[in-house]
Amino acid sequence: MKATKTTYQKDHMGLTPSQIVNELNRFIVGQEKAKKAVAIALRNRCRRKRVEGNLRNEIVPKNILMIGSTGVGKTEIARRLAKLTYSPFYKIEATKFTEVGYVGRDVESIIRDLVEIAVNTEKTLAKTEVDINAREQAIERILDSLVGKTSSSETREKFKEKILNGELDDTEIEISVADTTPVGGGSFEIPGMPGASMGVLNLGDVIGRALGGSKTKTKKMLVKDAMAIIIPEESEKLIDQEKIIQQAINLAENDGIVFIDEIDKIASTGSSGAKNAEISREGVQRDLLPLIEGTTVNTKYGPVKTDHILFIASGAFHIAKPSDLLPELQGRLPIRVELNSLTKDDMIKILLEPETSLIKQYSALIGTEDVYIAFTDSAIEKIADYAITVNLEVEDIGARRLHTILENLLEDISFEASEMKGRKITIDDKFVENQLSKIITNLDLAKFVL
C-alpha cells in the first residue's frame, strides 16, 4: 500500500492550480471561478505539507461557500476534486441535522462517517497490495480440500495449474470459511447519542477473539465461489489493521473534504413565524462552528482532529442570504464563490464536451444492444432549448433537467432496443420535436413529466 499511496500523492503534489482546473474541465462545463477557488484551496494543502516546524500546524484550510442554484455544478466540482486528490469525501445536507439534545443526527456524525470512508479507502488499497499473496494462500486452502494436506508437491502443482486455468471452477468442494452469520439481537440507538448505534454483544464471540480464534463453518461450494470468499479472508489476515486505522485517521485529518449542501436552509431569515424552527436552525449552525474551526471528535477508531479538514458549504440562497448565517459561521467560510446559472450554450456543452457526457452515456447504453444512435447538431440544440424553457417556466434545476428530457426522448428506443439489433438511428430536431413538443407546450404536464 505504501508504494501505491506514495506514487499517487507525488502525482497530486505536483498538480498546479491550472492543472487542477484542466482536470476539472474534463468533466465540468464552465464555473471557472469555483474551479479556481477549489484549485487554490487544494494547492494550499500541498504547500502546507511542505512547511517546516510549528508553523505548519497554524496554517488552516480556507473553507469555501459556494452560492448557486441546484444543478449548476457545485457538488460535482467537490466530488471530482476528491477523486483527483485521493481524498476521503463526504457529502451531507445541512437539513439532516438537529441541535444537540434533540432527536436526530448530530453534526459530529459527519466526522465519524468521513473516517469510515477513509478506513474503507485504506483497506481497499492495502488489499490490492496483498492480493497476490492472498490469492496464493486461498489456492493452498482449496488444494488442501481437493487433494488433502498430505498430498505430494507434484500432485498439488498439477491441481494448482488446473485451478489457475479455470478447469476446476465448477468442481464442488467442502471447505471451512469464516462464519459471517450475524449473532445477537441486532443493534439499537444509544440514548443521548443520535446517529450512533450499538450491537448486542455475543459473549462467546468476544472470548473467542480474545483467545485469538474466530468462528468458522464448513460449507459445500464450487471452487470459483470458494476463491471469491477465501481471498478477502486471507487479505484480512495479511493487512495490519492498526496501521490501516492510523493511516485512515491521518488521511481524514489532513486530506478529508466535507461538502455540506443546502446550508441556506439552516439560515435564520427572520421572516418565518416559527420561532422554534429558527432557534433549531441557529443551534445547528452553532454546532457546526467548532467542527469547522477545529475540534476533536471521538470515533470508534479513536479521536480525530478537524483542524485541517476542508469544508465546502453550498446553497442556492433563493430566500435566505449568506449574511443570514451566523456571523461566526460566515467567518469560518472566508472564500465565497458565486456559480452562474446555465445558459443554452452551457447546456449544449454539457451534452457534448465532458468525457462522460450524457450523450456518450446514452449512446453507450443503447450500443450494448447493437443499436447505434447519432445526434445531429440541430437535435442537440433543440434539447438544450427545451431544457432552458422548462427550467424557466417550471423550476430551475440546472443540468439535471437534461436527464429527464433525455429519458423521455429516448424512452421508446430504450424499450424496443433489444428487438432492433443492427439498426442505426439518427436523432434530429424533428425527432426531438415529435417526442417532446406536446409535453413542453403543456406546462402542467411538463411539471409532472420533466
Swiss-Prot record:
Keywords: ATP-binding, Chaperone, Cytoplasm, Nucleotide-binding. PANTHER family: ATP-DEPENDENT CLP PROTEASE ATP-BINDING SUBUNIT CLPX-LIKE, MITOCHONDRIAL-RELATED, ATP-DEPENDENT PROTEASE ATPASE SUBUNIT HSLU. One of its GO terms (biological process) is protein unfolding. Pfam families: AAA, AAA_2. One of its GO terms (cellular component) is HslUV protease complex. It is found in: Cytoplasm. It comes from Rickettsia akari (strain Hartford). Its main location: cytoplasm. Belongs to the ClpX chaperone family. HslU subfamily. The keyword Transmembrane helix does not apply. A double ring-shaped homohexamer of HslV is capped on each side by a ring-shaped HslU homohexamer. The assembly of the HslU/HslV complex is dependent on binding of ATP. ATP binds at V29, G71, V72, G73, K74, T75, E76, D261, E328, R400. GO terms for molecular function: ATP binding; ATP hydrolysis activity; peptidase activity; proteasome-activating activity. Coiled coil: none annotated. This is ATP-dependent protease ATPase subunit HslU. ATPase subunit of a proteasome-like degradation complex; this subunit has chaperone activity. The binding of ATP and its subsequent hydrolysis by HslU are essential for unfolding of protein substrates subsequently hydrolyzed by HslV. HslU recognizes the N-terminal part of its protein substrates and unfolds these before they are guided to HslV for hydrolysis.
